[in-house]
Amino acid sequence: MFDKIKNFSEILSNMGSFREKMEEVKKRIASIRVVGDAGAGMVTVTASGEGQITNVFINKQLFDADDNKMLEDLVMAATNDALKKAKEATAYEFQSASGGLDFSEISKMFGGKFG
């Protein structure tokens, strides 16, 4: 019984440093910027580690094209590429901070945003 109390006490005493580490990870994630591209760079989309689109570039040659569907497909592909990279970068930050723990199960509890 006392061992369980001791273990619980150790967990509580480490919560402060864990909380600090998670705050540091949140700051690093907020500063992450990744670029997804499609059409050999004709469309690029920048996303933050938080999964927000921060920039979209479309080569002006695509505006002259008669095929809007192609442009739509390229924007969608570049966006999905950027969001995938952001998710991977975020998962890496969490795993690095946790000593390699897999956060995929914990992430599911938070809507799947972190790995």
Swiss-Prot record:
Keyword rRNA-binding: no
Keyword terms of this UniProt record: Cytoplasm, DNA-binding
Subcellular location: Cytoplasm, Nucleoid
Pfam families the record matches: YbaB_DNA_bd (PF02575)
HAMAP family, per the entry: DNA_YbaB_EbfC
Subunit comment: Homodimer.
Name of the protein described by the UniProt record: Nucleoid-associated protein LA_4332
